[in-house]
UniProtKB/Swiss-Prot annotation:
Residues 80-97, 272-288 have a biased composition (Polar residues). Component of the ERMES/MDM complex, which serves as a molecular tether to connect the endoplasmic reticulum (ER) and mitochondria. Components of this complex are involved in the control of mitochondrial shape and protein biogenesis, and function in nonvesicular lipid trafficking between the ER and mitochondria. MDM12 is required for the interaction of the ER-resident membrane protein MMM1 and the outer mitochondrial membrane-resident beta-barrel protein MDM10. Residues 1-454 form the SMP-LTD domain. This is Mitochondrial distribution and morphology protein 12. The SMP-LTD domain is a barrel-like domain that can bind various types of glycerophospholipids in its interior and mediate their transfer between two adjacent bilayers.
Amino acid sequence: MSLDLDWNLLDDQLSDRFLETINRALEASASKRPSFIGDIQFEKLDFGSDSPDVAIRSITDIWPDFVSIDEPPLRRRGARQTTPASNATTLVESPTDSFGVHHGGVGEIPLRTYTQFDDAAPPNRIHGPPSVVSASVAGSGPMTPAAAAGVANVFSQQWSTALASRGIRAAGMGSATSLPQTQVTSPVDSVPPSPGYFQHWQQHQQLATTGFVPYSVINSRQTSLDASSLRGGGSGPQSSVSQIGVKRDSNSLHPPLGGTYANGLGPRASMRATSAPSFRSISGQNSPGEEREAVASPSSASQLPSLQMRLSLVWPTTTFRLTITTSLLINYPSAAFMSLPLTLSVTGFMMRCGVIVALEGEHQRAHVCLVQEQDDERDPAFVSAGQAAAGSEKKLNSAGINILPQLTFESEVGQHEKHVLKNVGKVEKFIAEVIRKGLEDELVYPNYYTIDLPASKRHSL
């Protein structure tokens, strides 16, 4: 799928706003500027007539890093409109609680706990906080029938508490009577088990108590339903918890691990490659006030959707112009003893990258960042150009060079009325490194920009 861009909308007014934003960022980072570089000023920006080639690669749930967990969504601040969230990964946000020995001797858990269930792992292992059951269901050694039944009853009570707190009833579990919130002593107890683990436990529980496993339990994969749908009496949609294994196979859900971050050299060596989180209370249920707010309003149909698009961008241009003015300072025998005016003009570049646009409908905002293209998506000619820019045939480790391998400049050192040095190679190379480094530090994931969108009744993609 491709996008049609109206390149004429990039007018002088938008260019001026971009320049103001860039110059404010430069003023804020003036202390990081080298001592031999004077004040930097971006004076002119022209996007040119060469528009990029943009294509949609995937549309998925929002990455957890983009979700605004520090403030409630608009519907909780008074706007009566909701957007259902995915349950593929659960983000529990709750006050810090202390747990005793009956929770495995765990002291305190973080305010926010990310829990991911991995169906590819053995069914008796769960990746998450220690307060989630991670021991073998069958035990580490042989058990008598009575001991096996006792272990099954213990796990039955634990999972019954967790499922009942979410209003979920599973086959073979008995009644799903809601328990008081005081009985749900751990925030992570509201997290449903993964399908593989729950099915294994259910079969073992049936085997320990009755000596056989019902056929319906073996074939059942729908172990978790949305609490709101069960509350309404309908069967409800299948929870995305049972589809984690399918979603995890999609490369579009994972931040790229190539380049600097794959080697553990970036600011975030280990990134969470999960789907969007869902916000739930300790008990896993909405309060009565939130239930009333969750009623769909007439304007909810026109609300901005919550989704994430991955775009592929290829932008070769020779008409782009960006004028930069600064000065070279000579700090001997004293500071700023001599100053040489320096004017740089970017006259063209070659850019290829992935663009992540995450629309957060509940907060009316958009998150934008750049990512490196995957190895199988990159053009061999583009890779060779990046290798030439790096000066070696080795695998590139710099995201800035991968995204922006070619930059052309016109430079002038001095003043027109006096002596002028043109096209100074070392100065141009230094400025190119500064631009690539700035691009990597500002826009390349895990760095991103958040844009507050104006409230409107209708939005179109």
